């Protein structure tokens, strides 16, 4: 009986140690809200987001949106730079935009990879990084 009690106590301690030793992970979803590059792709309905389009989308606007996205995602990482293990995104035009996001100085240390679905309607592009 005494051995069983000791065994149960040790098992409970081992279980508790394993549970408390686990590191929480961050998983994030972010709607990028019409994040387009500036290149007109005839395969994609992106005419609105080109330098000639109604939104006059250009490299200055692109760089500003890229910087804002970098800031938001880096702020989620926090001061301890605990980067999210997965970031789901929507409304992204193509892989090139995602590559620019993960190459920014604050996001590059996260060592992200990309899984992306190209949609003919660019607004519906989704990805995980």
Question: Model-predicted segments: where are they?
Answer:
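Bacterial Sec-dependent N-terminal signal peptides
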Residues: 1-23
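N-terminal, active-site-proximal structural segment of metallo-dependent hydrolase catalytic domains
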Residues: 20-105, 111, 115-126
């Amino acid at each position: 009986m005494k051995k069983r009690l000791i065994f149960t106590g040790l098992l409970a301690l081992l279980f508790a140690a394993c549970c408390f030793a686990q590191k929480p992970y961050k998983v994030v979803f972010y709607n990028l809200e019409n994040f387009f590059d500036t290149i007109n792709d005839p395969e994609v309905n992106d005419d609105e987001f080109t330098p000639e389009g109604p939104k006059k989308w250009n490299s200055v606007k692109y760089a500003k949106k890229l910087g804002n996205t970098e800031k938001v995602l880096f702020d989620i990482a926090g001061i301890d730079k605990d980067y999210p293990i997965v970031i789901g995104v929507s409304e992204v035009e193509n892989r090139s935009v995602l590559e620019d996001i993960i190459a920014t100085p604050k996001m590059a240390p996260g060592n992200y990879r990309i899984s992306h679905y190209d949609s003919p309607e660019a607004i519906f592009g989704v990805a995980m990084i």
